[in-house]
Every structure is written in C-alpha cells, then in structure tokens.
C-alpha cells in the first residue's frame, strides 16, 4: 500500500515520525513522509496514494489552508484511507468538519489528560482488522479525556482511568475517570478513517 505520512507541528514529531515510518515500512508499505501539507491540495499527487497518515498537529498557525482541507476531504471521501495518530486529532477552531472526518478529537481548552503513566489498553473487538492478533496490553502513555466523540464510530480499543486530581494548565484539575475510546474506524464519504 502507498502511504503518505504528513508530519510536523508543535509536538516531538522528529522523534515519533521515524519510528512510525519504520513500523509502516516493516509492515511492507511504501511510505513517503513530508512536513509540507501543500501536497494535500494537489489531486494528481494525492491520487498516487492509497491512504493518508497524519502524525502532525495542524492547529493555530499550522492549520491547513482551505485548499489543503478541501484536497484532504476529496481524497478521503473519494474512497481513500485516513489514519489519524495521537494528537493529530486536534480539531482546529476554523475547521470543525475535521471532527466529522476523524470521529473525535482533542478540543483546545476542553480536552485534557492525566500525567504520562501506565494503563491497560483493552481490545473490545478482537475480530476487528485494526487489532487482528492483538490482545489487551499495558502501555505508558497519555490517556486522553474530554474528547469530542462523534456518533458512528466503530470502537475496537479502550483505556480506563480512575478519578484523580492532577496539574493541568497551571492548576490542580479534577479529571473524572472512566473508560475512553482509543481506537475506532468510521466512514467519511466512500473513505475509511482509522
């Protein structure tokens, strides 16, 4: 499969993107990585890819242009794939339709997470292709909370957190525990979002 990975933004992508690229190549994919999202506006170039992978933060001064947004929407809704990794789900204030594409995303000023720590990832649909051969596992990561989830997501993986009070935004903040979706698929037009 030919994959385009869009990287860059305010996060340590210089560390995570090479790991992601190695993983995807190791799985047999043909991978192109770019920090320049202008390719999204080039339908000819995008037509050469099977799926778009976002390992990027495109909000604030790095928000996609209207042409890039439209190119991305056309690519996905036209039947291609879109994989949104980690904080790539941040919903830009000026592009709320992104939430419809991703099915859920970090909302600046509303979403949060407890400190980086260990929690169990539960595979809720062992037969789902997104977790084929994977069983529950422990990980060290941030468990996102306060995410704006949309209807129509086919959730196959969750994480659980206890209630707690942690520093957030310069003050101690109560964070209600619960079970939160971590991985899902959904449709956007004729495309598949993962």
Protein language model features and the residues they cover:
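Helical hinge/lid and interdomain linker segments adjacent to catalytic or ligand-binding clefts
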Residues: 2-92
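Short secondary-structure boundary micro-motifs
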Residues: 5, 57-58, 105-106, 167-171
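Glycine-centered flexibility motif
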Residues: 8, 55, 81, 103-104, ...
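Short aromatic-enriched loop/helix-cap "lid" or pocket-rim segments at secondary-structure transitions
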Residues: 16-18, 95-98, 167-170
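Conserved long hydrophobic alpha-helices within structured protein cores
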Residues: 46-50, 96-97, 152-158
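A glycine-rich, often tryptophan-bearing local segment used as a flexible ligand/cofactor-contacting loop or short
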Residues: 59-133
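Catalytic beta-strand/loop cores that center a nucleophilic Ser/Cys/Thr
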Residues: 110-192
